[in-house]
């Protein structure tokens, strides 16, 4: 009986983690004022990409953890507004 109860508790926690709690990520570009967005259901990471061009260092923030081209730095994280 104790084993069944423990299994039920673990399954409940896992299901709540999958369904609950959308991530909030910063989504401002370069030197713009801070803005945030609530990510789509199931998206649990934020990213910050940065690169240099003729305008200087540029940055982009958002939800997820995209692949990047060579020369672009990417940082991914998994707490709210961790990509500021």
Swiss-Prot record:
GO terms for cellular component: extracellular region. Expressed by the venom gland. Disulfide bonds join 25-46, 39-63, 65-76, 77-82. One of its GO terms (molecular function) is ion channel regulator activity. It holds the Pfam family Toxin_cobra-type. Residues 1-21 form the signal peptide. Binds to muscle nicotinic acetylcholine receptor (nAChR) and inhibit acetylcholine from binding to the receptor, thereby impairing neuromuscular transmission. Gene3D superfamilies: CD59 (2.10.60.10). This is Short neurotoxin SNTX-1.
């Amino acid at each position: 009986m104790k084993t069944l109860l423990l299994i039920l508790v673990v399954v409940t926690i896992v299901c709540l983690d999958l369904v609950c709690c959308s991530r909030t990520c910063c989504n401002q570009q370069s030197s713009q004022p801070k803005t945030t967005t609530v990510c789509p259901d199931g998206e649990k990471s934020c990213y910050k990409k940065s690169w240099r061009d003729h305008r200087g260092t540029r940055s982009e923030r958002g939800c997820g953890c995209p692949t990047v081209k060579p020369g672009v730095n990417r940082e991914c994280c998994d707490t709210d507004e961790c990509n500021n």
